[in-house]
Curated annotation (Swiss-Prot):
Name of this chain's protein: Glycogen synthase
Organism annotation: Prochlorococcus marinus (strain MIT 9515)
Broad EC category: transferase
Gene: glgA
UniProt GO BP: glycogen biosynthetic process
CDD domains: GT5_Glycogen_synthase_DULL1-like
Length: 483
């Protein structure tokens, strides 16, 4: 099949959140299944220096009263074709925000539609989040192009109908209040990025006022869990880590822990319980819970906390104050640094993800891959990926809590701290976590089934047993399943 992914991000060139990882990493797995897969993204200013781009555009056209050009490049790691939509509105390099954000992404969506009709016509146009939400509306009139729409985060829903009508001159567009609703109505298939999140968004609590619509379209809604690139994220060959390691030489992780403590200004002591967090510092991620429980945790235990990320100023200020109050025990770097994030994954003992909601989550997958035990709230993709630790039966991969309450989070933290003191069982917990299979291979098979379904292709699809071989929550090594 010819498959075109349209999105605002594509890792590693342009990445803000999990969408960038999906759009960057899913195509290689689909290509291995025999499909012609390409990606189209806005031509942000910095991309012209990062990629080898065709000197002349492969396509020019006019839409929404503006001329645009499409250039061809190659993904820097996986070498598949990436198309860049060139227009001055993208030159600043700003991805999200700004006064023209609504117009900017509606223009990108319209340009992608023109490109798909007139240059490279896919059988499936796979759109991601509200930034591409108008594409299924326009493609609905073309029987040769089927559309799939992926919900990465329902909270962000795009411009409202009155603004869309003004920008696109589509007075017939009378269904749905905004871009996200339009996409869900007109797309041939809709998926969320985890099975649990697909169920949650049909409820009032998590539906962001769209639960009624999501129940209405539930027949074409499904959940497909994200994966991670196991070659890019492999502690055994990760050159960023001072000490590479695997499940057979876990003792080497302590070298990374010591370097992490030094770099983040913490007391250097490999016996201390070190909690890490790499996150956008926003309410969704439960940073307010971290603020509420940290003083008590540091008073009761000998723990250390290392946090990396940027976000809301009031949360940044609260974390910064904790770092001032607890020097050597609490550290926060208000930036994003890929090398330091890898060191946190590969050097911390446990990883914090007390999310209010979590469509899928990538960080808990990376943490487990690198032997850092996740402490998570049982919500969204965290339910699908982190198995509760059960010391009596020697199973589980992390520590979980249910209610978004400080006492529940604190209790989970104390349980993890107590478990950490039992070194032999903690090592087995790390081995179980590191042995989980979270590759893109299973996800690609599920997407392929959905693509074939939406295109009405009747030739045999992959046997369901092939998908089960890559079942999430299962060990990559059968001999380790019962450790």
């Amino acid at each position: 099949m010819r498959i075109l992914l349209a999105a605002a991000e594509c890792a590693p060139m342009i990445k803000v959140g999990g969408m960038g990882d999906v759009v960057g990493s899913l195509p290689p797995s689909l290509i291995k299944l025999g499909h012609d897969v390409r990606v189209i993204i806005p031509g942000y200013g910095k991309l012209w220096n990062l990629l080898e781009i065709s000197s002349e555009p492969v396509f020019r056209a006019n839409t929404m009263g503006n001329e645009f050009s499409v250039y061809e490049a190659k993904h820097p790691i996986h070498n598949y074709i990436v198309y860049l939509v060139g227009h001055p509105t993208f030159d600043s390099g700003q991805i999200y925000g700004g006064e023209d954000e609504d117009w900017r992404f509606t223009f990108f969506a319209s340009s992608t539609a023109e490109f798909s009709w007139n240059y490279w016509k896919p059988q499936v146009l796979h759109c991601h989040d509200w930034h591409t939400g108008m594409i299924p509306v326009w493609m609905h009139q073309d029987p040769e192009i089927s559309t799939v729409f992926t919900i990465h985060n329902l909270k962000y829903q795009g411009p409202w109908r009155w603004k869309l009508e003004k920008m696109t001159w589509c007075p017939w567009y009378m269904h749905g209040d905004h871009t996200m609703a339009a996409a869900m109505l007109y797309a041939d298939r809709v998926n969320a990025v985890s099975p649990t999140y697909a169920d949650e968004i049909k409820t009032h609590e998590y539906g962001e006022s769209l639960d009624g619509l999501l129940n209405y379209i539930s027949g074409k809604l499904r959940g497909i869990l994200n994966g991670i690139d196991l070659n890019e994220w492999d502690p055994n060959i990760d050159k960023v880590l001072p000490a590479q390691f695997n499940i057979k030489n876990l003792e080497r992780r302590s070298e990374n822990k010591i370097i992490l403590q030094k770099e983040m200004g913490l007391e250097v002591n490999s016996k201390k319980y070190l909690l890490g967090m790499v996150s956008r510092l926003v309410d969704q991620k439960g940073v307010d819970l971290v603020l509420q429980v940290s003083k008590r945790l540091l008073a009761y235990t000998d723990s250390q906390i290392a946090i990396l990320g940027t976000g809301d100023k009031y949360l940044e200020s609260g974390l910064w104050q904790l770092a001032l109050d607890y020097p050597g025990r609490f550290s926060v770097f208000l930036t994003y640094d890929d090398s330091l994030s890898r060191l946190i994954y590969g050097g911390s003992d446990a990883f914090l993800m007390p999310s209010r909601f979590e469509p899928c989550g990538i960080s808990q997958l990376l943490a487990m891959r690198y032997g850092s035990i996740p402490i998570v709230r049982r919500v969204g993709g965290l339910v699908d990926t982190v198995l509760p630790h059960d010391p009596e039966n020697n199973c589980g991969t992390g520590f979980c809590f249910d209610r978004f309450e400080p006492i529940d989070f604190y209790t989970a933290l104390v349980r993890s701290w107590e478990a950490f003191r039992h070194k032999d069982s903690w090592k087995l917990l790390q081995i179980r976590a590191m042995s989980q299979e979270f590759s893109w291979q299973r996800s690609a098979l599920e997407y392929e089934l959905m693509y074939k379904d939406v295109c009405g292709i009747k030739e045999p699809s992959p046997d369901i047993t092939e998908i089960e071989k890559f079942s999430y929550g299962q060990s990559a090594d059968p001999s380790l399943k019962k450790i």
